[in-house]
Regions:
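Broad gene-expression machinery/nucleic-acid interaction feature
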Residues: 53, 74, 81-85, 139, ...
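Dual-mode signal for accessory low-complexity, basic/Gly-rich regions
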Residues: 175-255
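Short beta-strand elements
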Residues: 75-105, 215-217
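Acidic low-complexity segments
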Residues: 1-77, 110-150
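Fold-independent oxyanion-binding glycine-rich loops
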Residues: 56-61, 89-91, 145-147, 191-194, ...
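Extended active-site and interfacial segments that coordinate phosphate-rich ligands
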Residues: 83, 103-109, 160-168, 229-244
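Short acidic, glycine/serine/threonine-rich loops at helix termini
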Residues: 62-79, 96-102, 152-158, 200-203, ...
Length: 255
């Protein structure tokens, strides 16, 4: 009769998207080294005096999860990522800045051929280091890069949508009510775990199937993210957002 236990879903499923030929475990050490050497050859110019050090790195990870519950759930799913990045330390007039370009993909082949983008980013950082001036204090109209907009949305809105934060916070419960207008009509935000992208999880770490959860539609609050506990306490539906760092940690509500 426990309301939290009642919320737990029972699925029997196998979702192995990365177990075939493109599994990163099939990529040899020599192939990873060749990827690093490729970017060193294409993107490292030792004749630029302002670049005092640089680094090229790559890594990969494959994870297969088996989930079983006393209610009868049996779920097998997998996930993989691989990365490559080029970073530069740039010193101009005694001031050191650093920057570069980083790629996170599902398959090694998708990490190749980005040298033009890396060089463009390197030149942007060089231009900044050489020519940037102090901004005068004041109010400005700013055009934000997509990555900056995403970070603001993640930090200022996304974490507030994680329902476990409000369980013991009466003020937040009163402030963050469904139907409240909190943003522009141009802003709609959706959370999905089954999209093949960063954060992919067709089932969360409580065995809940991923859902399409509209957090905001045209600036109006329409949903929030739950695990079984927060959904039971607030009387709302599961969203599939109980995420555990690993089997050694309890799941938490996260985007």
């Amino acid at each position: 009769n426990d309301p939290v236990v009642k919320k737990f879903q029972v699925h029997k499923d196998e979702v192995l998207r990365f177990a075939g030929e493109k599994n990163v475990k099939n990529v040899t050490r020599d192939e990873w080294k060749a990827l690093v050497d490729y970017y060193i050859d294409k993107c490292i110019d030792k004749s630029i005096p302002e670049i005092n050090s640089w680094g090229v790195f790559t890594s990969c990870n494959y994870l297969k999860k088996n989930f079983y519950s006393s209610k009868g759930a049996e779920i097998v799913q997998d996930m993989q990522n691989c990365w490559v990045g080029v970073n530069y330390n740039i010193t101009v007039d005694g001031v050191t800045t650093n920057g570069g370009k980083f790629y996170s993909k599902f398959y090694k082949a998708d990490l190749e051929g980005h040298e033009e983008e890396v060089l463009k980013e390197r030149d942007r950082y060089l231009d900044f280091a050489r020519n940037a001036v102090q901004a005068e204090p004041g109010e400005y109209t700013c055009i934000l890069a997509p990555v900056t907009t995403a970070m603001f949305a993640h930090e200022s809105f996304g974490h507030k949508s994680e329902a476990d934060f409000m369980l013991n916070d009466k003020t937040l419960q009163e402030e963050w009510v469904m139907g409240k207008k909190v943003g522009s009509d141009l802003v709609s935000i959706c959370d999905r775990g089954d999209w093949i992208n960063h954060g992919y999880a067709p089932y969360d770490d409580e065995g809940t199937k991923a859902t399409t959860c509209w957090l905001m539609k045209e600036g109006v609050l329409t949903g929030r993210l739950h695990d079984a506990n927060s959904a039971a306490v607030l009387g709302e539906e599961l969203t599939g957002n109980a995420r555990a760092q690993s089997y050694q940690f309890a799941p938490m509500v996260r985007m």
